[in-house]
């Protein structure tokens, strides 16, 4: 069974008791709320076990441990172990090459979080966690990491202009159902390139964003927002690394990797668009 979003509502222990799940899996971002509200204690009392995983806050640190746990509880250890080996190999390759860069070879990057989700409004960004980790691991210098020590926060467009980033990234997804009037770049399994390109062009024409040198020179990438909450986060690292350092990663093919992962490790058919650059 699934439950209402515990980030936007209180978790109902009563509902859990009625449904009698064998296990409830929570994201680590809910841990403090679950403790403070007494939910964890109540679930323990009624004998419902809980598993905490993290693909969101410190994804590159905790994905391996989270996948190992999921492999155990779902009796899929061989599959989980194979995924972990592939995951570690791909990330290690990126890290080894990025380690050869001098500090001045790491371009500055501003990443706009959920760009356009609330219309023309700008800008939220990522700090040292989540996509901030992806950028730094991929050989970039995330501007938000200097502003926020955790997941991120809000900056005004004047700050973005003043930072004059070498590259401008933005995250997007198909939020059309839950966010009325969204202008976000639709990315994910049900999206198409033509629609995503049109939405991206509109966001790049916003006042303040359209004056950025990175935008004028098309050093721009839109990337799937939910990469930061999935074990496929290494694909985002690969795609960003290749975008920032095309010569260094000319033999890396993130598109082939994401298709291969779906075929080998999931029950999902690959489809859609997960990142793009402006035409």
What is each of the regions a protein language model found here?
Residues 38-120, 152, 211-278:
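Extracytoplasmic substrate-binding proteins
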Residues 11, 153-159, 203-210:
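Alpha-helical scaffolding within the catalytic cores
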Residues 1-19, 23-35, 39, 143:
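A short, structured surface patch at a secondary-structure boundary
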Residues 143-158, 164-191:
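Pocket-lining segment of extracytoplasmic ligand-binding domains
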Residues 177-213:
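C-terminal lobe and pocket-closing loops
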Residues 13-17, 132, 157-158:
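Short hydrophobic/charged patches on amphipathic alpha-helices used for structural packing
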Residues 28-29, 172-173, 224:
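Short secondary-structure boundary segments
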Residues 128-150:
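His/Asp/Glu-enriched short active-site or ligand-binding loop at hydrolase and phosphoryl-transfer sites
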């Amino acid at each position: 069974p699934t439950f209402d979003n515990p980030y936007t509502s209180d978790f109902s222990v009563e509902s859990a008791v009625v449904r009698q799940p064998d296990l409830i899996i929570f994201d680590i971002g809910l841990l403090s709320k679950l403790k403070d509200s007494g939910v964890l204690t109540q679930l323990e009392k009624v004998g419902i076990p809980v598993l905490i995983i993290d693909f969101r806050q410190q994804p590159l640190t905790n994905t391996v441990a989270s996948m190992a746990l999921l492999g155990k509880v779902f009796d899929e250890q061989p599959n989980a172990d194979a995924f972990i080996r592939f995951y570690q190999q791909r990330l290690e390759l990126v890290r080894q090459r990025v380690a050869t860069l001098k500090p001045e070879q790491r371009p500055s990057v501003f990443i706009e979080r959920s760009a356009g989700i609330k219309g023309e409004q700008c800008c939220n960004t990522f700090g040292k966690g989540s996509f901030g980790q992806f950028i730094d691991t991929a050989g970039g210098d995330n501007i938000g990491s200097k502003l926020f020590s955790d997941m991120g926060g809000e900056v005004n467009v004047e700050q973005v202009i003043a930072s004059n980033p070498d590259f401008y990234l933005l995250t997007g997804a198909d939020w059309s159902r839950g966010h009325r009037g969204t202008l976000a770049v639709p990315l994910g399994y049900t999206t198409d390139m033509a629609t995503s390109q049109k939405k991206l062009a509109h966001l790049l024409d916003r006042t303040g964003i359209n004056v950025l040198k990175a935008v004028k020179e098309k050093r721009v990438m839109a990337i799937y927002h939910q990469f930061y909450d999935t074990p496929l986060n290494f694909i985002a690292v690969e795609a960003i690394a290749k975008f920032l350092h095309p010569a260094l990663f000319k033999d890396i093919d993130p598109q082939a990797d994401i298709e291969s992962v779906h075929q080998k490790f999931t029950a999902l058919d690959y489809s859609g668009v997960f990142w793009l650059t402006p035409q």
